[in-house]
């Protein structure tokens, strides 16, 4: 089963009609993955046995005609815990780690009878923007195999873009769903902070991390997000809000919607060709009956600096649990207790993770806490207030998801600051905890451009409504990758 020209509804119809069984679907999907992985390298682990067993159970009963996820193979980012299936966070530190329980989001998908087909590649501990910091492999962009798929959820994005799976889960701390979605020409949403449980997600920066969804269409995205959303008492940051019917918002009507374009998001750092695509997208919204006006989010220019202080500080705390004692990698060279700590962490973590731990530890140290971490917290408040002011008068904020299209493998790996700036347009929504989605907005020199749609807290419905209307008007989601370049 190649999903390039399929969606949840089309595959579901075949299952309901009896033209396809869940077992056949899994077998076909595994064949597709086996073929395309030679080019893309999106997966770290394929759970062939588990997927076939789950499919057999589904085939033992009639398919529920009202459950679009029944029997659907889904990719899971490898920083989400999966019971009995290796979960590595793409780090040598967790190379052989097998969890004994599922993350809440995985549990919820299984309750909907979705099938976990495998674990997708990512930047180590989700720290990166290209999936090049993975300890195990470098995922390629299906549109050009010489280019990055983005990150940190590059494996999930590439798997969906390549047609290996119909949907996949990712996590987004500073743009790790939206940026790869833009680079791969697919739909990716980071929901409101607290909308989806983080229980069982390996923590990077706990005040920023959020689990979200990749898909080829807005409708599929809404279906999967519906399934994984909701309060979870195991996660203290999970919001006890009723989950609306996201698909009900997909009516294609945005007449009367007030949409803001932040002038800071269209500044000189955005490539002219990318900016032109977004300007065309803005005209599309106007033609659909929305009011579009320019606004200012003045403190967004400080978002990257603020983010790297806060995220690195939280990471240095979260990753202190990997010490060679309880679980994870332990250096075979360690002779003393101090050796266990120092050598296990030095050998188990990659360069980018160590860089961020050091940065965070520095920002939290007693002599520099007020100068860095405290100030970053204050700037975060100002960024939140900017959005609150705009949302008093507008329903949504739109702009480019990324300043450029996908860059070449190896191009930015030696310059961390250049890599960090790649998330300049996605970070503000994480700082404010707002829902934000990237939808395909056309091509520049054969590579996808993403349109970012940011909504008010817990108003994913408006984000989906606008995204769906844009998708229906443009049909950019029907573009398929060329698989050019690389060794293919």
Swiss-Prot record:
It comes from the Bacteria. It holds the Pfam family Amidase. It catalyses: L-glutamyl-tRNA(Gln) + L-glutamine + ATP + H2O = L-glutaminyl-tRNA(Gln) + L-glutamate + ADP + phosphate + H(+). The active site is at 77 (charge relay system), 152 (charge relay system), 176 (acyl-ester intermediate). Keywords: ATP-binding, Ligase, Nucleotide-binding, Protein biosynthesis. GO terms for cellular component: glutamyl-tRNA(Gln) amidotransferase complex. GO terms for molecular function: ATP binding; glutaminyl-tRNA synthase (glutamine-hydrolyzing) activity. GO terms for biological process: translation. Its EC number is 6.3.5.7. Disulfide bonds: none annotated. InterPro entries: Amidase (IPR000120), Amidase_CS (IPR020556), Amidase_dom (IPR023631), AS_sf (IPR036928), GatA (IPR004412). Belongs to the amidase family. GatA subfamily. HAMAP family: GatA. Allows the formation of correctly charged Gln-tRNA(Gln) through the transamidation of misacylated Glu-tRNA(Gln) in organisms which lack glutaminyl-tRNA synthetase. The reaction takes place in the presence of glutamine and ATP through an activated gamma-phospho-Glu-tRNA(Gln). Heterotrimer of A, B and C subunits. This is Glutamyl-tRNA(Gln) amidotransferase subunit A. The gene is gatA.
């Amino acid at each position: 089963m190649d999903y390039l020209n399929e969606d949840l509804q089309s595959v579901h119809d075949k299952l309901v009609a009896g033209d396809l069984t869940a077992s056949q679907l899994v077998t076909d999907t595994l064949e597709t993955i086996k073929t395309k992985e030679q080019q893309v390298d999106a997966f770290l682990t394929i759970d062939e046995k588990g997927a076939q067993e789950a499919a057999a159970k589904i085939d033992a009963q009639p398919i529920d005609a009202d459950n679009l996820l029944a029997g659907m193979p889904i990719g899971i980012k490898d920083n989400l815990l999966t019971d009995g299936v290796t979960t590595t966070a793409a780090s040598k530190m967790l190379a052989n780690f097998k969890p004994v329980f599922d993350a809440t989001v995985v549990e919820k998908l299984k309750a909907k009878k979705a099938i976990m087909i495998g674990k997708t590649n990512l930047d180590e501990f989700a720290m990166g923007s290209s999936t090049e910091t993975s300890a195990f492999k470098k995922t390629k962009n299906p549109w050009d195999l010489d280019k990055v798929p983005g990150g940190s959820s590059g494996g999930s994005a590439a798997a969906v873009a390549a047609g290996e799976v119909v949907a996949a889960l990712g996590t987004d701390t500073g743009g790790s769903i939206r940026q790869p979605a833009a680079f791969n020409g697919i739909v990716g949403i980071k929901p409101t902070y607290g909308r989806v449980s983080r229980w069982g997600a390996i923590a990077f920066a706990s005040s920023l991390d959020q689990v979200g969804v990749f898909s080829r269409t807005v409708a599929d995205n809404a279906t999967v997000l519906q399934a994984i959303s909701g309060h979870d008492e195991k996660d203290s940051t999970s919001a006890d809000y009723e989950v609306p019917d996201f698909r009900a918002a997909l009516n294609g009507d945005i007449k009367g919607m007030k949409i803001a374009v932040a002038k800071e998001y269209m500044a000189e750092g955005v490539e002219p060709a990318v900016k032109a695509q977004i300007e065309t997208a803005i005209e599309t919204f106007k033609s659909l009956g929305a009011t579009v006006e320019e606004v200012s989010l003045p403190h967004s220019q400080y978002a990257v600096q603020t983010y790297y202080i806060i995220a690195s500080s939280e990471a240095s705390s979260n990753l202190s649990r990997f010490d060679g004692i309880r679980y994870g990698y332990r250096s075979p060279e360690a002779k003393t207790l101090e050796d266990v700590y120092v050598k296990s962490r030095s050998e188990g973590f990659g360069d980018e993770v160590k860089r961020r731990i050091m940065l965070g530890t520095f920002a939290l140290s007693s002599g520099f806490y007020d100068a860095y971490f405290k100030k970053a917290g204050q700037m975060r408040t100002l960024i939140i207030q900017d959005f609150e002011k705009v949302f008093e008068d507008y329903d949504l904020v739109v702009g480019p998801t990324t300043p450029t299209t996908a860059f070449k493998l190896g191009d930015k790996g030696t310059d961390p600051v250049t890599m960090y700036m790649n998330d300049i347009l996605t970070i503000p929504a994480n700082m404010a905890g707002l829902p934000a989605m990237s939808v395909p907005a056309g091509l520049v020199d054969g590579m996808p451009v993403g349109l970012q749609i940011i909504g008010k807290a817990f108003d994913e419905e408006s984000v989906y409504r606008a995204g769906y209307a844009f998708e229906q008007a443009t049909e950019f989601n029907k573009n398929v990758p060329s698989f050019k370049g690389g060794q293919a």
